Amino acid sequence: MYENFCIYHIGLDDFDLLSYGCTTHVATYLLHSLAKRFSSIVFIDYPNLVRLNPSIPWKTRGNGAIAIRIAMECTDLNNLLEAAEDIIDEYYEKYGVRTKDVVSSDREPGLVVVRNGIVNDMGSLYITALTDVLLPEIVKKKIDKYGRENIVVSKRYCGRGIVGAAASVGWIAIDSDYTYELLVYRSEKFYSLDRCVNEESVKYFDSITKDRTFNNIDVDSNRILITSHGRDPILYGVRGEDPEVLLKALDIIRVCEPISSWTIFRTNQATDAHAIDRSVSSLRVYRTGKIRVTISSKPSIGMGGTVIINGFDATGSITLAFFRPSYLNRYASMLIPGDVIEANGHVKPWNIGPVFHVEKFSVLKLAPLYRCKAPRCPYCRKRLTKMGRGKGYKCDKCGYSVINPDLECEYIERKIRLGLYIPPPRALKHLIKPIERYGKEKYRHRYPIELKLSQITKILETSI
């Protein structure tokens, strides 16, 4: 397809600043500037917004890294890296931030440029960064193994972000589900002001695209979910199954402040990509996974309404936590010993040991529930009373006693049902697949594809 061209992948992560800015905004600037600098450039995928392990305590704000995939006339990797570094420097200079201030802040940005030949070998980096702990030292060893002729790391931007940068590049090597997100950016002079998005237009957009978009509004609370809330460049973001339906938002959703630019990203958001099958014995702190366990204890209520319950499989036992903000605690409180559930989540350290934080769960089997009471005395018909554990029952009226009588039991209908229990849209994290996406999964991405810059992104305000 690209005779005499070389394919390159640019990965970047942790370019957010606390006061403003985000890695996707940097990527938008980078896309346009690369197109200006290299006339032969062809974009062979939408920029990838790759969400990584949500359990990691030192994760970035949205825990999302970016990969840009291009074909162009062959050049030295260092030439492309230097161009990317200079463009990012220019981006920060536009906002009055010096490069040394970026790398000396609480952020640790990372930037890598990769030749296409080794990308298939980088899939394991993505899987580990998505589901486990991947340390920068391990990534650096891998990079050294690949060789500088295949991958180069920025000397200006070589912080912890190289983990996400390398992992985002590796995503393309894994056949997996994906979605798209259109991010619309605001003018810098409006960063300190409340976002001005017409809610009725969002509801209308949702009503005519709901079969191809998701998480636009939360019906129960009547809350709009597409707007960002921090001091950052994002005005709103809409998520869906294909780019064409997302572009309709630009014509339908009304805003009362300037739009500076927009970009469409292909992403692993809303796919449950991190929920890989695991046994209980394979769980470790900060690992993500999906486990199938039998409940072994009655629910207990912890601080803040958190429901704590124990479960086991053939390999071991684990404590599970269901939190109030996810609204799963109300359903978990109905579980009893013997129930079988499948739970997605991640492991966090507690003072009682590792605890599996449940993000969603399915009830696969319900144990029968009975309410039992002591039998009546066969002589005087008064109900027997229990004398203590292992001591049997006694009639207080006539003195009759029995060690192990048949109890009078009645079947109690369970309040919980078989099926999936998932948080409402307002409580969903980036990677969790919403109910609307079940049955719409994709299993392979057509790659490479040829895209014009105008299909991916557009700048409407020259200040970006």
UniProtKB/Swiss-Prot annotation:
How is this protein annotated for GO cellular component?
Answer: cytoplasm
Catalysis performed (reactions) = cytidine(34) in tRNA(Ile2) + agmatine + ATP + H2O = 2-agmatinylcytidine(34) in tRNA(Ile2) + AMP + 2 phosphate + 2 H(+)
Q: What is its EC number?
A: 6.3.4.22
InterPro entries this protein is in? TiaS-like_TCKD, TiaS_FLD, tRNA_Ile2__agm2C_synt, Zn_ribbon_TiaS
The primary site where this protein sits is cytoplasm
Q: Which domain of life is it from?
A: Archaea
- The entry's keywords: ATP-binding, Cytoplasm, Ligase, Nucleotide-binding, tRNA processing
Gene Ontology molecular function: ATP binding; ligase activity, forming carbon-nitrogen bonds
The subcellular location is: Cytoplasm
GO terms (BP aspect): tRNA wobble cytosine modification
Entries under Pfam families matching the protein: TiaS_FLD, TiaS_TCKD, Zn_ribbon_TiaS
EC main group: ligase
Q: Which residues form a coiled coil?
A: none
Similarity comment:
Belongs to the TiaS family.
Q: What does the UniProt function comment say about this protein?
A: ATP-dependent agmatine transferase that catalyzes the formation of 2-agmatinylcytidine (agm2C) at the wobble position (C34) of tRNA(Ile2), converting the codon specificity from AUG to AUA.
Q: What is this protein called?
A: tRNA(Ile2) 2-agmatinylcytidine synthetase TiaS
Upper taxonomic lineage: Archaea, Thermoproteota, Thermoprotei, Desulfurococcales, Desulfurococcaceae
